[in-house]
Amino acid sequence: MDVSLLLNVEGVKKTILHGGTGELPNFITGSRVTFHFRTMKCDEERTVIDDSKQVGQPMNIIIGNMFKLEVWETLLTSMRLGEVAEFWCDTIHTGVYPMLSRSLRQVAEGKDPTSWHVHTCGLANMFAYHTLGYEDLDELQKEPQPLIFLIELLQVEAPNEYQRETWNLNNEERMQAVPLLHGEGNRLYKLGRYDQAATKYQEAIVCLRNLQTKEKPWEVEWLKLEKMINTLILNYCQCLLKKEEYYEVLEHTSDILRHHPGIVKAYYMRARAHAEVWNAEEAKADLEKVLELEPSMRKAVLRELRLLESRLADKQEEERQRCRSMLG
């Protein structure tokens, strides 16, 4: 076996089990990548969580399309066709896996993955912990851990090799489509149709990212597109907050802030997501940053801080009540 560390990727180790053929495929933005995967725990039994071959349906993702588990794009773009490789991924990359897995299982069971409802009660409320409907995924969500992904790369299709409406547009048409998609996303959001709104924002982001690949990074035109992309990503995150997809919000907002540390809305959204998953200190730090960068948001920041303190007090009271009941 050929063991190698993926360069410039913290918390990822790769082991090639079967070498692929030819050169690395051209993974351009918009390429559709088809692959089989098996997800395992890092315990002695290498407990299998999901296996696409057992489902009988390979997985596919679109490069640059904000796939929930962003590290998979990194893993796949290191592979050749036919290659089988095992990737150990640290917890920093696997926090959103339970939500992805839930969606994949819902699809495999013939259910609509957007129709599920979040339920909280009793002990679950105490930890602000939402059931995903699968016991093993609930456990993973409560206690994130490193995971192993066994991946077999089957196919890479360029944007013009499969049917995707966005790619039927030329550059000028793509740019014209962006404000229309943005506006439609806003309209759907106001109607409370958050899944559909998120899809519109994603389509607009894909258009812009494709245009951005034609510009020199960090120059004027590239930065103009980057600003538009960040605005749409934050709109997308607003939908995720409504859908209670808090860990994905943390990923997207943190990624924006790594490259653009002055975006106030990203700090504000990340603070709200941190608060929902009981990262109280992180939430407070982000809210303080909002206040530092935008003093005019003082009223909104104080409201969020009061809400956080109230929820923390409720949680502590539930814990006290639980301890009393356990002691009889």
UniProtKB/Swiss-Prot annotation:
Chain's role: May be important in protein trafficking and/or protein folding and stabilization.
TPR repeats: 178-211, 230-263, 264-297
Tree of life domain: Eukaryota
Lineage per the UniProt record: Eukaryota, Metazoa, Chordata, Craniata, Vertebrata
Disulphide bond pairs: none
Signal peptide residue numbers: none
Tissue specificity note: Highly expressed in retina.
Gene3D superfamilies: 3.10.50.40, Tetratricopeptide repeat domain
Keywords: Cytoplasm, Nucleus, Repeat, TPR repeat
Cell compartment(s), UniProt: Cytoplasm; Nucleus
GO molecular function: farnesylated protein binding; peptidyl-prolyl cis-trans isomerase activity
GO cellular component: cytoplasm; cytosol; nuclear speck; nucleus; photoreceptor inner segment
PANTHER family per UniProt: ARYL HYDROCARBON RECEPTOR INTERACTING PROTEIN RELATED, ARYL-HYDROCARBON-INTERACTING PROTEIN-LIKE 1
Gene name of this polypeptide: Aipl1
Protein name per its UniProtKB record: Aryl-hydrocarbon-interacting protein-like 1
Record's subunit section: Interacts with NUB1.
Gene Ontology process terms (BP): apoptotic process; negative regulation of apoptotic process; phototransduction, visible light; regulation of opsin-mediated signaling pathway; retina homeostasis
Domain PPIase FKBP-type residues, every copy: 53-145
